[in-house]
UniProtKB/Swiss-Prot annotation:
Species in which this protein is naturally found: Pyrococcus horikoshii (strain ATCC 700860 / DSM 12428 / JCM 9974 / NBRC 100139 / OT-3)
Family: Belongs to the eukaryotic ribosomal protein eL33 family.
Chain's gene name: rpl35ae
Protein name: Large ribosomal subunit protein eL33
Ribosomal protein listed as a keyword: yes
Keyword annotations from UniProtKB, A to Z: Ribonucleoprotein, Ribosomal protein
Amino acid sequence: MRIKGVVLSYRRSKENQHTNVMIIKPLDINSREEASKLIGRLVVWKSPSGKVLKGKIVRVHGTRGAVRARFEKGLPGQALGDYVEII
């Protein structure tokens, strides 16, 4: 089952930004319980030039279905607001 998601932002605090961890909102998932079933799945983002960056969902973020995905190499800023595929 493939799910589309939107990249919301980097994981960050007031002073630090973790560029290899992204907050992703899967479409049609609106609760923490549904999002917890996605932990361990692969996340794929395709750049406009054709590069493919892969990450893994590591935990839930918040109560409305967002998740955190860790990538080996961080996503560029142009990925913010773009779609990813959750496999």
